[in-house]
From Swiss-Prot:
GO process annotations (BP): gluconeogenesis; glyceraldehyde-3-phosphate biosynthetic process; glycerol catabolic process; glycolytic process
Catalytic residues as annotated in Swiss-Prot or TrEMBL: H90 (electrophile), E159 (proton acceptor)
Species, as recorded: Helicobacter acinonychis (strain Sheeba)
Any one Pfam family match given in the protein's UniProt record, by short name: TIM
Gene name, Swiss-Prot/TrEMBL: tpiA
EC number: 5.3.1.1
Gene3D superfamilies listed in its UniProt record: Aldolase class I
PROSITE patterns for the chain: TIM_1 (PS00171), TIM_2 (PS51440)
Protein name, entry field: Triosephosphate isomerase
GO annotations of cellular component type: cytosol
Length: 234
């Protein structure tokens, strides 16, 4: 399977730097990168999607066409921007913004009906990890049970919560074992990504694991040269 690199800017990228980054990345890449390289700016960092060399996505959207949803972006906004790729279930939205499994299912079903490419994020906390692989499997199974795993436009991203933004990536053995379990659980044709303190030093080794189909990269991707380095490993 072709490897994938995704950049998640979260809320850390200045608006105009984001715009410049997207334009420069478009110049750097080639058409064959379009289905392999994804960028998720925040809302103000988005541009109308005329990019041919990578896929532009959004970090979040509300599961309605439009309406009285103060502060939210909806499918009509995304349609106007020609964006049809979306992150759902990132741990920061689950934990900090209290998005429940039922609400995540509502989002998933809504954007599935719109035929969006969905990147669905899962991952356990440190307390669960310390209980062992059996507890991790049970936790991840519960996170996946509400969504249609046969949806053809689905990508799953495994991001252990304890490794996000901490500088402490999961060990290669942890990734190998967890991805091995997930690959057995998921459709074999579905891309399965790893995220959690990915950087230019560990990306190549992680991509070398057969069950890792790509990377979801946070803070390291904020510098274009770092992201280009990781893309070169694909």
């Amino acid at each position: 399977m072709t490897k994938i690199a995704m950049a998640n800017f979260k809320s850390a990228m200045p608006i105009f730097k984001s715009h410049a980054y997207l334009k420069e990345l478009e110049k750097t890449l080639k058409p064959q990168h379009c289905d392999r390289v994804f960028v998720f700016p925040d809302f103000l960092g988005l541009l109308p999607n005329a990019f041919l060399h990578f896929t532009l996505g959004v970090q979040n959207a509300y599961p309605k066409d439009c309406g009285a949803f103060t502060g939210e972006i909806t499918s009509k906004h995304l349609e106007e921007l020609k964006i049809n790729t979306l992150l759902i279930g990132h741990s920061e939205r689950r934990v900090l913004l209290k998005e429940s499994p039922n609400f995540l299912k509502e989002k998933f079903d809504f954007f599935k009906d719109k035929k969006f490419k969905i990147v669905y994020c899962i991952g356990e906390d440190l307390k669960t990890r310390e209980k062992g692989l059996g507890a991790v499997k049970e936790f991840l199974n519960e996170q996946l049970e509400n969504i249609d795993l046969d949806y053809q436009n689905l990508i799953v991203a495994y991001e252990p919560i304890w490794a996000i933004g901490t500088g402490k990536s999961a060990s290669l053995e942890d990734i190998y074992l967890t991805h091995g379990f997930l690959k057995q659980h998921l459709n074999q044709k579905m891309p399965l990504l790893y995220g959690g303190s990915v950087n230019t030093q560990n990306a190549k080794e992680i991509l070398g694991i057969d069950s890792v189909d790509g990377l979801l990269i946070g803070s390291t991707s904020l510098e274009l040269e770092n992201f280009k380095t990781i893309i070169s490993f694909l």
